[in-house]
Amino acid sequence: MNLHASQAEIDTLEGVVRRAPPGEGVVAAKVALAWHLRQRDSARTLKLVQEVMPVVRASRASTHGDAIASCHARAALAAAEASALYGEVVEAERCLLDARAHLDATWDPQAEGDTWLVEALVARTRGQAERALAALRQAARCFQQAGEGERLEIARAWTLFETMTQQPDAALSDEPATAGPGDSGMAHDAIRCAARALALACRNPAAAARAFTQAGELAQARGLVLLEVSCLLGAGAAIHDLGDYDRAARCFDAAARRARVTGWPTLQVTCDMYFGSLLCDLGAFDESRRTLEDVVEALSARPRGTLLACAHAALARTLLATRRACESAAQMDAAMALFRAADGARDLALNLILQARVLGASAQPARAIEALAEAQALVEARGFDSMRVRLCHAQADLHHRFTLPPPGGMTQPTAALHFAEAALAHGRRLTGWSARAALHDFLAERWAEQGDHQRAYAYARQALAAKEKETAQKMSYPLALLRVRRRAEMRGGPEHAIAPSSHASSRHHDGLPGSVAR
């Protein structure tokens, strides 16, 4: 059985399920359909598994080893992945054990390796990064020993993706993935392209946005819905980083609409987190705070990991923007504890910079200096070029607020100007980057203090132009869209906050063996 299927292949299976008489053929078709719909339609997967499991169990009890009984492992695997996507990790683990207990290499030789792939997804859902990587490597070993070349490519691609999630500075070949025939072609290309985007996000946001977009399109064609939505969010985040709020809002909106169709609660709340962060930059601080408080509350009920850390940090940024420094510091402390536990260099560096700004605003310069020194060491060691703008801007702000020793090699009149000019210079090296009004304002004020009114005037004009652009963005489509969509989601449809779906509730009542990637 293939790991992924095209829509045409799924349509064929649908026809078999509709037309075939009861018996071995229709059971096998239903299990195959459940497997291939596990991300395209998780609720349908669980319904199909519920239908076939009594027949499968009865067959195993009477004629151990026949074709129907051999479907047990594959059906349990499909339920495991679907349950994980709904955030029901305990049920997912149970299904995984059920699948392993009924592996039958004679009838389904790929199932053992596929079990490791599903375990990796369950592990990612639980924030168990090391377990996820170990499972992916074990999957690759299984496929290599079995001579499953297509699946081996996919397992290797997922290993690369997981590595880039944790270590985006890891070596990544500049050669594009080679499209293979059949199952592996678009699937492993999509995963490798997404891994490349993760690596580029720290260095070249514009290129990262293009790579995420390409990966998302490939993922959609192969039914990798979780990867598809993650890539939409990744593209939006990269574009947001470049200051294009309108395009970022479109990406986030597309991700939210796609996530809502899945019914996966954690994915929907993740989309809200990106919305909440964008609302802060659009000036809708109260709405941003309320949205992010809801996200933190919802994610706190799930396995604690990097996603919750990101939500705490996003809320801290909004609170900082509204001059609630003490509350912001508390959120950052919670975020940093989780980031350090996860040991991800990119997230740690990025949020050390934010923590330094929060500490500076709450009159803790010594701790702020320590945070920036640690962030700078990570940025320089890992080559996180796109973070240099934030790093230098935070250093400039800290030196302006407090009397601190000047940096070595300073060529500007003050340390604040030294770092602010460096932030602008680093930004101009990034394709598609545009300076925010706040940076131009800062430079204008600092040069005016030094009596260089010509430079101050030039920066003031640039600040005015940037403000006009930002004001236009705040008044136009994105803010209205985000507000309308959030209100609509809170009014109707499935519950907006994380809660078991109706599909999940029904299958527990039915006693099904049931089952998110980051």
Task: State where each predicted segment sits.
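TPR-repeat structural position
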Residues: 6, 23, 42-43, 89, ...
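N-terminal leader/linker segments that initiate helical-solenoid repeat arrays
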Residues: 1-39, 47-50, 70
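Hydrophobic positions within repeat-based interaction scaffolds
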Residues: 433, 449-512, 516
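Tandem amphipathic alpha-helical repeat scaffolds
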Residues: 28-42, 71-88, 111-127, 151-167, ...
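Solenoidal tandem-repeat scaffolds enriched in leucines and small polar residues
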Residues: 131-199, 203-210, 214-230, 264
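Amphipathic alpha-helical segments of tetratricopeptide repeats
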Residues: 15-18, 50-61, 97-107, 137-147, ...
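Intrinsically disordered, low-complexity Ser/Thr- and acidic-rich flexible linkers and loops
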Residues: 61-62, 401-414
